[in-house]
């Protein structure tokens, strides 16, 4: 990919630098960077006794003006995506929202990888969910899976937001609500941002309740597509704000959303 600028003749002109950006599932802007993120296999040095690799965040930083492209160092265990929420599951990030020099991102639980499924003798597999562990490789494209994985989350009635101190994503605070399911729209391998700030500094976190599409009831959310809020000046969910989108739309949900102006959003 490459970037463009408007020249003196008011024409779009390509910059000289061209970049082979690695695979990503979400993206956003922070300070001078266009950032991308995905979750993938970590270094072989971190393999467990079975040879299974942990999932880690794979980040890219494109500085358009300087025409530089860098990535994170996955030797740093701070980028570990495994057991990110304390329930054994790995996560992927959906959205990169810059707010007061921090990054807000939805942490979307993805289930147990081979690495997570075997950890501590399978301690993270909930009782009664043993049959959800895959017994062979299968699926295709973004829904492919490997033997030993427990694909998709066991906790569909939770929404987590990670608040990172800066673009390195190495230090964070996690906040949780059980009013909505995880906050992202999804199309194949892309996890769409559904967390946006209003002009007054409030942050609105939308969930389309994608987990309603899960085939197994144990992994299917019972929560409506809805929205919650993080009030300006706080880093917690507002306990007094919840809005069911389905209740106001005849049971309909949405795929994506964007901030327009003020506290208006387009879905």
Mark where each language-model region is.
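Beta-propeller blade signature
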Residues: 2-3, 51-68, 119-170, 218-235
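Structural signature of eukaryotic scaffold interfaces centered on beta-propeller domains
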Residues: 19-35, 40-41, 86-100, 187-203, ...
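Hydrophilic extracytoplasmic domains
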Residues: 9-18, 199-203, 207-267
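Post-signal peptide N-terminal segment of secreted/secretory-pathway proteins
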Residues: 1-84
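Surface-exposed loop and turn segments in beta-propeller and other repeat-based domains
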Residues: 3-19, 72-91, 168-190, 233-255
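Loop-centered beta-sheet repeat module
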Residues: 154-162, 168-230
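Short glycine/acidic-enriched loop and turn motifs that connect beta-strands
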Residues: 39-53, 89-90, 110-114, 210-214
């Amino acid at each position: 990919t490459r970037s463009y600028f408007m020249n003196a003749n008011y024409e779009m002109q390509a910059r000289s630098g061209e970049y082979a950006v690695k695979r990503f599932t979400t993206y956003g802007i922070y300070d001078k960077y266009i950032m991308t993120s995905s979750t993938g296999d970590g270094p072989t040095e971190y393999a467990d006794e079975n040879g299974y690799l942990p999932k880690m965040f794979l980040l890219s930083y494109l500085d358009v003006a300087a025409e530089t492209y860098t990535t994170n160092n996955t030797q740093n265990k701070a980028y570990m995506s495994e057991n990110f929420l304390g329930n054994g599951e790995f996560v992927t990030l959906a959205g990169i929202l810059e707010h007061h020099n921090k990054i807000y991102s939805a942490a979307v639980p993805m289930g147990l990888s081979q690495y997570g499924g075997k950890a501590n003798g399978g301690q993270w597999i909930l009782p009664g969910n043993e049959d959800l562990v895959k017994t062979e490789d299968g699926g295709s494209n973004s829904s492919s899976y490997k033997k030993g994985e427990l694909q998709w989350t066991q906790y569909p009635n939770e929404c987590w937001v990670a608040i990172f101190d800066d673009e390195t994503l190495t230090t964070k605070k996690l906040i949780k609500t059980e009013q909505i399911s995880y906050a992202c729209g999804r199309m194949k391998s892309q996890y769409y941002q559904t967390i946006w700030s209003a002009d007054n500094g409030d942050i609105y976190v939308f969930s389309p309740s994608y987990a309603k599409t899960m085939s197994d009831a144990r992994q299917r959310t019972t929560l409506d597509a809805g929205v919650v809020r993080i009030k300006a000046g706080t880093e917690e969910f507002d306990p007094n704000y919840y809005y069911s989108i389905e209740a106001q739309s005849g049971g309909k949900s949405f795929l994506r959303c964007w901030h327009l102006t003020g506290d208006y959003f387009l879905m």
